[in-house]
């Protein structure tokens, strides 16, 4: 649902989608990739979709892989966004370190009042709010 919200509310259309998943949660990753592909096509573009499977709770490897990917993409002048909504804590934590250190463009999170197993547009907008923590971080007083 976060991806749909980002596409529709932010008009953010990535060239590359990189999915990170832990081994225990990787069984449906092909379905996730297919869903992202279908949504992207509905919005008129076709990003490359790749994924990386990591060991469960392997924070160090996750952080290293994410930092390596982000540095490589920044060298190629990509704008970089991450979605932390569905992530498990070790992966989210590993993603937030480079987000701040390497100054990512967006850290998206879909805040929902109640988890509902429904598509984004079927859930009342009052029940969900797309947040961009990088935008919000700029408002933090130092």
How would you label these PLM feature ranges?
Residues 1-79, 90-142:
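Long, low-complexity, Lys/Arg-enriched
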Residues 87:
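Conserved TIR/SEFIR loop-to-helix hotspot centered on a Trp-containing motif
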Residues 82:
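Conformationally flexible catalytic loops at phosphate/diphosphate-handling active centers
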